[in-house]
């Protein structure tokens, strides 16, 4: 597809934006990256995502695709002729991949946020829920190198961005992911060896500093 315009409206610590950075990198799609100031959202963001007014937004030839998981599927469908395939070819396997991506969105984000945004009993409950969620994901991974089997794919893309926040989660939740979920950490390190992932995820200490600023704003520091 020649003369295509692809723009990504994003914010660097967003694990949801990281999904699109990784998917575009895997498909080797050239795009323009536009960093958003979420305290002063651009007219383009408000125009392209008038319903939710949030990032990330993938803009393809002037048309917006909102919600990160939907946008990853869009990337696969539009550039399906470009290797690698991000979704399994089998309909059942595709359905399972979508199930786990949905599970990640509904469970992991909220538990992780509570780890740094709460204190006391609420934080302890969030830590228990967070670790339990990771153990469920470890069970889904099984003994395979990636969630899709031998190849990096849809569920890996949906999940790996959270790993950049783990240092912050562990710091404020006072636990070790490696001690609790070693198989999960081994998977994450395997993913980090991929160029598409390594260049799309910010350093964990940088995310920690960002979260410290957020905690100060919330009066938690």
Curated annotation (Swiss-Prot):
One of its GO terms (biological process) is glutathione metabolic process. It catalyses: RX + glutathione = an S-substituted glutathione + a halide anion + H(+). Its EC number is 2.5.1.18. Transmembrane segments: none annotated. InterPro entries: Glutathione-S-Trfase_C-like (IPR010987), Glutathione-S-Trfase_C_sf (IPR036282), Glutathione_S-Trfase (IPR040079), Glutathione_S-Trfase_N (IPR004045), GST_C (IPR004046), GST_C_Tau (IPR045074), Omega/Tau-like (IPR045073), Thioredoxin-like_sf (IPR036249). The keyword tRNA-binding does not apply. Conjugation of reduced glutathione to a wide number of exogenous and endogenous hydrophobic electrophiles. It is an enzyme of class 2 (transferase). It comes from Nicotiana tabacum (Common tobacco). GO terms for molecular function: glutathione transferase activity. Residues 90-214 form the GST C-terminal domain. Signal peptide: none annotated. GO terms for cellular component: cytoplasm. Keywords: Auxin signaling pathway, Transferase. This is Probable glutathione S-transferase parC. Belongs to the GST superfamily. Phi family. Abundant in seedlings and roots. It is also found in the shoot tips, flowers and leaves. Induction: By auxin. Glutathione binds at residues 14, 41, 55, 67-68. Residues 4-83 form the GST N-terminal domain.
